[in-house]
Amino acid sequence: MPTSEPNDFFHGSVGIVQTQVATFDSLTLEGGETITPLEIAYETYGTLNQKKDNAILVCHALSGDAHAAGFHEGDKRPGWWDYYIGPGKAFDTNRYFIISSNVIGGCKGSSGPLSTNGNTGKPFQSTFPFVSIGDMVNAQEKLIRHFGIHKLFAVAGGSMGGMQALQWSVAYPDRLKNCIVMASSSEHSAQQIAFNEVGRQAILSDPNWNQGLYTQEKRPSKGLALARMMGHITYLSDEMMREKFGRKPPKGNIQSTDFAVGSYLIYQGESFVDRFDANSYIYVTKALDHFSLGTGKELTKVLSKVRCRFLVIAYTSDWLYPPYQSEEIVKSLEVNAVPVSFIELNNPAGHDSFLLPSEEQDSILRDFLSATDEGGFF
């Protein structure tokens, strides 16, 4: 919960916030193994009403965390969706109780490879069990019950967060009123899997990999940095890279690259290794690649059980999760007569568009939530 007055850095900020951790006895994974105990890092913004029917769960993407809005003490930058979460914003904390949690398998406070194995007293690292998108959602469901919430007003997310939102609609059809899926898909294509495989192989090829049992003093940093560089290319569009970098020379005294785009990617890779774990990168990308609700008739059958309204947003410039994948979701929902609104935004920023400030996107989210909050259609 916020612990101070709103920060002036961003108008409408929820202010200074703290990440909390909820601990549960255990979670049985879809593969049959058990996480004991289960820890979930989370943050909340706003106030849960007496009926407990105003809660919105926001789900993060691959490298995200529970810190979606506001500022941690001493930070200069706010949470990853601060533009959209806060008083008077699209996810209005004057109306809604926003919950954001770190996925299990990650490395930002929830159970994952960095967690301590009770049998050895050491971090699990690569011995941590495989975690699926379904497992991530089942862990979130425990957190929702922890708050005494039976039905969420909405579940929202982009990219991997969109997959979690989709999984919520299928696994717990009576537990959410609205589902917002942005820049996502019902399953990864061969190309999407290929991008992730290159990143994983970069990590596995690092001399410090040591079968995933590396020390913090000798981590596979070069491999993880290369994985992040590869991934970051897919998050941007050709137009954005052309406009931002073109063929400009690198800034500063950088000898290892001849171009500005190269120095940018090197910076992204090097800064990433300071805030993310290589094992978690492998676990989370595998969860992404193994997620599948199917396509075509198979997807239509799976989505026949959903009971909520949908907002699906795609981006013309997103070549990592191209609009046709969102359209497949929409078509399957329409066959099942599920209320769905589909919008393709011509945002030049590529896949990262769902994360970036946009007045148009803010208006779309705001209008959808307001319409359904009032019992109408968007």
UniProtKB/Swiss-Prot annotation:
Cite the AB hydrolase-1 domain residue spans from the record: 54-355
Residues at the active site: S159 (nucleophile), D318, H351
What domain of life does the native source organism fall in? Bacteria
Pathway(s) annotated for this protein in UniProt: Amino-acid biosynthesis; L-methionine biosynthesis via de novo pathway; O-acetyl-L-homoserine from L-homoserine: step 1/1
**Chief subcellular location:** cytoplasm
Which Enzyme Commission numbers does its entry carry?
2.3.1.31
Compartment(s) where it occurs, according to its Swiss-Prot or TrEMBL record: Cytoplasm
Q: What reaction does this enzyme carry out catalytically?
A: L-homoserine + acetyl-CoA = O-acetyl-L-homoserine + CoA
- An individual GO BP term: methionine biosynthetic process
List the PANTHER family. Answer: HOMOSERINE O-ACETYLTRANSFERASE
Role according to the record: Transfers an acetyl group from acetyl-CoA to L-homoserine, forming acetyl-L-homoserine.
Family recorded in the similarity comment = Belongs to the AB hydrolase superfamily. MetX family.
Record text on subunit structure and interactions: Homodimer.
Q: What is this protein called?
A: Homoserine O-acetyltransferase
Q: Which gene encodes it?
A: metXA
